[in-house]
Amino acid sequence: MKQFIDFINKSYTAFHAIKNLEEMLEKANFKKLTEDCSWELEPGCSYYVIRNTSSIIAFKIPKSTTNVGFNIVASHSDSPSFKVKPNGVVIDTANDFCKLNTEGYGGMITYSWFDRPLGVAGRVYTQSENSVKEHLVNFDETLVIPSVAIHLNRSGEFNPNMQIDMLPLFGNSSTSFDSILKKYVGNEEVISHDLFLYNKEEARLVGASNEYILSSRLDDLECSYTSIKALIESDAKAISLCAVFNNEEVGSRSNNGADST
């Protein structure tokens, strides 16, 4: 259980989750494949392939491949969240606020995002001479989406607008998002980013006998972790395959989603 909780706590985004799953597979002697090369697979060996640093397929081939079938399990690496837009901030000069410019991602329970310590993590692309670099980042800064005081919401209704009521506070109006971003990628030119909010509260066991897990991102990291763990520990009698796709929360129709090739 501790290993699972540790996995959840350091899997801030789909990109971090795939990196952590890859480390598990590497420790179990799975061999990495790439899609731009032909594969020479051997009976009794284990392999994995990653696409777009956010999806992974791992499989085991039994020693005997005569009349074998497939055992397949699938899950997804992404979780409901808020995604940072390309124009990263909204400056409210009148109230001296800098808000992170976000949009909803996936099927979230909106009220669970209020009044919690929120982090920003994901990947950032920079231009370096003649190449593009990908950086996996996790901001030290903590944000918050504040709720409204009760005397300002007498109606009792709760129907927040994500683009108005749920932009997280990032600092005062002089806060520079670009300057903070450069803390994590250096002075190289930032050309793009895939950044998401996540709940900084760590997973923990709760209940009289610690029989329950309290955590964000259980949808669907619980299945991602347990399916990869099961594959690693299995004694393959068939071709056993585990697929962890991205973008399930938004329809799976991406080049690294379940509706891809």
Language-model features, listed with the residues they occupy:
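N-terminal hydrophobic/helix-forming segments and targeting peptides
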Residues: 1-261
